[in-house]
């Protein structure tokens, strides 16, 4: 059985104004991941995601590249305990 957990990621580079959050939401929904993504004032994107461990690994791999017009310089990750979210939201 696959373990459920959450992760918080901070993504820096050209990640705002390139549909990063909307693309993350689309993929998260396909992978049945819940949580949220938001822009930060310093130009980074913060993502909080919860789901099955194997799906989170796939999602994290995508976060390290982002959508077509993005340029990801750094993507940090912190694993966190499971939290039950209903959907994936763009904040």
UniProtKB/Swiss-Prot annotation:
A GO MF label: acylphosphatase activity
Q: List the catalytic activities from the record.
A: an acyl phosphate + H2O = a carboxylate + phosphate + H(+)
UniProt keyword Coiled coil present = no
What does the record give as EC number? 3.6.1.7
Keywords, comma-separated and alphabetical = Hydrolase
What InterPro entries would the database entry show?
Acylphosphatase, Acylphosphatase-like_dom, Acylphosphatase-like_dom_sf, Acylphosphatase_CS
Determine if Translocase is one of this entry's keywords: no
Domain (Acylphosphatase-like) spans 6-91
The UniProt entry annotates the active site at 21, 39
Q: Tell me, what's a Pfam family for it?
A: Acylphosphatase
Q: What class of enzyme is it?
A: hydrolase
PANTHER family the record matches: ACYLPHOSPHATASE
| Family membership noted in the UniProt record | Belongs to the acylphosphatase family.
* Record-given protein name: Acylphosphatase
What is the species of this protein?
Answer: Legionella pneumophila (strain Paris)
């Amino acid at each position: 059985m696959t373990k459920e957990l959450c992760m918080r990621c901070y993504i820096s580079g050209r990640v705002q104004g390139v549909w990063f959050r909307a693309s993350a939401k689309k993929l998260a929904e396909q992978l049945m991941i819940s949580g949220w993504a938001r822009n930060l004032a310093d130009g980074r994107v913060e993502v909080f995601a919860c789901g099955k461990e194997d799906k989170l690994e796939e999602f994290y791999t995508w976060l390290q590249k982002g959508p077509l017009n993005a340029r990801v310089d750094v993507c940090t990750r912190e694993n966190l305990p499971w939290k039950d979210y209903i959907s994936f939201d763009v904040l």
